[in-house]
Amino acid sequence: MRIPRVVVSSAGVFHAYHLARGAQSGGYLHRFITSRYRREENGLERSRVVQITLPEYVSLAISAVPGEQARALSYYAGDNMYDWLSRRYVRDADIFHVFNHQGLYSLRLAKREGAITIVERSSAHPTYQHELLTEEYEKFGLRYPSTYRVLHDKHLAEYAESDYIMVASEF
């Protein structure tokens, strides 16, 4: 029996490096896709790391724009660009593990190619988080940026289309 090829994808830091190192130590890591490889994170075979840097720079540039929508727009643009560009690296995965909001398009392709898909969420359920933040914004007389609704909808679409959802928290 062939060893499953695991592809881990994360545009952010989170704990993705630990996940990738764990998969590598078991002989399963086929590829680790990330926005920018952090050199202080050691222990990964460099030949298994794919960097997709442009989305991170686009996101940083947008977040520097003044206004309440900038941060939400930076997530929307950066994560969607990362997701779109990372698709080319998931075709040969047997298991595709991606972090929430960074993988709807790549997840769809991986599934079409026969991979088992896992979406990981590092926070509260998106609907709960959306409701909580909307209430908090209102308490302070602020308007919750409408762009966050689009982000929320993508989170839910990833959940609906993935085979498994992983939450590494009890929150």
PLM regions with names:
Residues V13-H15, Y37-R39, H101-L104, S122-T127, ...:
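Short, solvent-exposed loop/turn segments at secondary-structure junctions
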Residues Y17-L19, N42, S106-R108, Y128-Q129:
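Short glycine-/acidic-enriched loop or helix-start segments at secondary-structure transitions
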Residues R36-I95:
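Active-site donor-binding segments of glycosyltransferases and PAPS-dependent sulfotransferases
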Residues A11-G12, S74-Y82, V98, Q102, ...:
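Soluble or luminal CAZymes and related metallo-dependent hydrolases
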Residues M1-I52, R87, R91:
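N-terminal subdomain of nucleotide-sugar transferases
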Residues D83-A93, L104-R108, R112-E113, H125, ...:
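Membrane-proximal helix-turn-helix segments that form the acceptor-binding/catalytic region
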Residues Y57-L73, E113-D153:
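Acceptor-binding helix/loop patch of EC 2.4 sugar-transfer enzymes
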